[in-house]
């Protein structure tokens, strides 16, 4: 076992909005250390979101944050082996993991989408998540449904 808990790395806020959550999202979006490319994809997606939802009184960043909140799961199931049987035990998710899961799901399902550029796909997924639909929102609903179905095993603790 390690002697001490490793220190959390400080994440700097992004240059345009000054928001740490944006930088975390871009870090998940980034491939091969190409952060500038990831930033341009993200900002391009927000511009597309702004044009798509121009009648909305919120800014593109607020729409993105609302979309993330809509696809953030509250509970997940973990496998726990007891007496030769494996049970799916519903557990609460800690806040950092909730944020991370929602960001990863948004990016994953944006990548799976059909579309021209990644910015287009990401913008479409953000708009869908904002409107409580799309693949990332469906994933959250599935996670909650699994937890609800296995509520009988909630007394097994980790």
Curated annotation (Swiss-Prot):
InterPro entries: Ribosomal_uS7 (IPR000235), Ribosomal_uS7_bac/org-type (IPR005717), Ribosomal_uS7_dom (IPR023798), Ribosomal_uS7_dom_sf (IPR036823). Coiled coil: none annotated. GO terms for molecular function: rRNA binding; structural constituent of ribosome; tRNA binding. One of its GO terms (biological process) is translation. It comes from the Bacteria. Keywords: Ribonucleoprotein, Ribosomal protein, RNA-binding, rRNA-binding, tRNA-binding. Disulfide bonds: none annotated. GO terms for cellular component: small ribosomal subunit. The keyword Ribosomal protein applies. The keyword Transport does not apply. PANTHER family: RIBOSOMAL PROTEIN S7. One of the primary rRNA binding proteins, it binds directly to 16S rRNA where it nucleates assembly of the head domain of the 30S subunit. Is located at the subunit interface close to the decoding center, probably blocks exit of the E-site tRNA. HAMAP family: Ribosomal_uS7_B (MF_00480_B). Belongs to the universal ribosomal protein uS7 family. Part of the 30S ribosomal subunit. Contacts proteins S9 and S11. This is Small ribosomal subunit protein uS7. It comes from Porphyromonas gingivalis (strain ATCC 33277 / DSM 20709 / CIP 103683 / JCM 12257 / NCTC 11834 / 2561). The gene is rpsG.
């Amino acid at each position: 076992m390690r002697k001490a808990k490793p220190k959390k790395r400080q994440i700097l806020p992004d240059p345009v909005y000054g928001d740490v959550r944006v930088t975390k999202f871009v870090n998940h979006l980034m491939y091969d250390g190409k952060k500038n490319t990831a930033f341009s994809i993200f900002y391009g997606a927000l511009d597309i979101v702004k044009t798509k939802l121009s009648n909305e009184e919120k800014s593109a960043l607020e729409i993105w944050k609302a979309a993330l909140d809509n696809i953030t799961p509250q509970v997940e199931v973990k496998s726990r082996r007891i007496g030769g049987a494996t049970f799916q035990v519903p557990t609460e998710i800690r806040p950092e993991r909730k944020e991370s899961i929602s960001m990863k799901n948004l990016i994953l399902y944006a990548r799976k989408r059909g579309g021209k550029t990644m910015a287009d796909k990401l913008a479409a997924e953000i708009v869908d998540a904002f409107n409580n639909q799309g693949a990332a929102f469906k994933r959250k609903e599935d996670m909650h449904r699994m937890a609800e179905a296995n509520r009988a095993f909630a007394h097994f603790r980790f």
